[in-house]
């Protein structure tokens, strides 16, 4: 199958790629979206991008993500990022649950996945990585959403969903953005103005807490307790505030590389059913690589993996793994096609302007 990857770029990134192709030195940051198992289609891309654009860099690169992207980027930011992402993938695929798991069981299994690729002994590798600067987005819960009981969370999320129909800015009534960043280099290229944003330097004591919090889905997992400024906060999935990284990036002669599982950017968690909700911010520096619609249609269920797979294949992990491994194989083909375009320079001909 040919033409299985789609490459879209904003005005500045498009001009750069048309002129010189995609060069390592031009990449100032990598972006990653929330989305649970959807990331599996990107596993192959993560590996080739690490080898081509992250390994043996001279200048630093921000790794900015929420939810599952935080986990991918944490794995890639270990001393051996290739081994890190492979260890994460292996334990992620191996997760198992009872027929009706509660949030305590799911939280415990998620912690086990985290420990498998990021034990305490490896945290320092991320904190002191010579070039990769991890930025972890989490959501601090407010009002009813601070409590881990089904009623409070259900009502709070319902109110959030309704207010979001009128304006995405109203999500800020329910969540604050807590952004954990590399203490050596503030992520000044992100010019956040929506919601209240609290910036917290990463260290050996809070990094794993931030990674876990960024993927803690409300109603599915327990909120993560975080002590800051003498107060106790409940942090949840970063996708609640920044689902697919519609970020206000500063202008400049750089590229924000975005391996994504979709050719559409959905700004917020509650925007998923809102087909009219478009990215708010300029995407001029973004180059987004995603599977083509034809590639996704070639999979046996005509879709990429998602969280529903745990219910669809409950009690039958062999069928789930068959589908997931098939997706990995397709993702590898996408990765190989993308790198051939980069290395040959033909990316200049394949890149297209963003569809808005």
Give names to the regions the model predicted.
Residues 1-62, 75-356:
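Patatin-like phospholipase
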Residues 67:
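Catalytic nucleophile serine of serine hydrolases
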């Amino acid at each position: 199958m040919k033409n299985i990857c789609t490459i879209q770029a904003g005005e500045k990134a498009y001009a750069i790629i048309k002129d010189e192709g995609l060069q390592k030195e031009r990449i100032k940051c990598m972006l990653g979206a929330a989305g649970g198992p959807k990331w599996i289609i990107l596993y192959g891309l993560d590996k080739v991008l690490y080898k081509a654009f992250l390994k043996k860099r001279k200048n630093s690169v921000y790794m900015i993500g929420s939810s599952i992207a935080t986990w991918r980027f944490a794995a890639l930011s270990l001393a051996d990022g290739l081994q890190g992402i492979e260890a994460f993938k292996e334990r992620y695929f191996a997760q198992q649950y009872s027929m009706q798991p509660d949030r305590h069981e799911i939280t415990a299994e998620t912690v086990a996945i985290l420990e498998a690729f990021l034990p305490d002994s490896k945290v320092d590798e991320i904190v002191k990585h010579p070039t990769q600067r991890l930025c972890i987005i989490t959501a601090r819960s407010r009002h009813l959403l601070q409590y881990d009981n089904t009623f409070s969370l259900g009502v709070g999320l319902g109110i959030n969903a309704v207010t979001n129909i009128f304006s995405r800015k109203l999500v800020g009534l329910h969540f604050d953005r807590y952004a954990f960043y590399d203490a050596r280099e503030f992520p000044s290229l992100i010019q956040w103005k929506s919601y209240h944003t609290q910036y917290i330097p990463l260290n050996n004591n809070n990094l794993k807490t931030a990674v876990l919090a960024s993927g803690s889905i409300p109603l599915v997992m327990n909120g993560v307790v975080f002590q800051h400024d003498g107060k106790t906060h409940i942090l949840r999935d970063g996708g609640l505030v920044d689902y697919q990284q519609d970020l206000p990036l500063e202008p400049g002669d750089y590229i924000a590389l975005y391996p994504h599982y979709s050719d559409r950017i959905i700004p917020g968690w509650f925007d998923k059913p809102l087909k009219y909700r478009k990215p708010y911010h300029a995407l001029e520096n973004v180059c987004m690589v995603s599977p083509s619609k034809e590639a996704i249609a070639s999979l046996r269920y005509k879709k990429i993996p998602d969280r529903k797979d745990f219910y669809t294949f409950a009690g039958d992990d062999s069928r789930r793994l068959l589908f997931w491994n098939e997706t990995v194989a397709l993702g590898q083909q996408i990765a190989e096609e993308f790198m051939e375009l980069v290395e040959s320079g033909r990316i200049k001909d394949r890149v297209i302007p963003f569809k808005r």
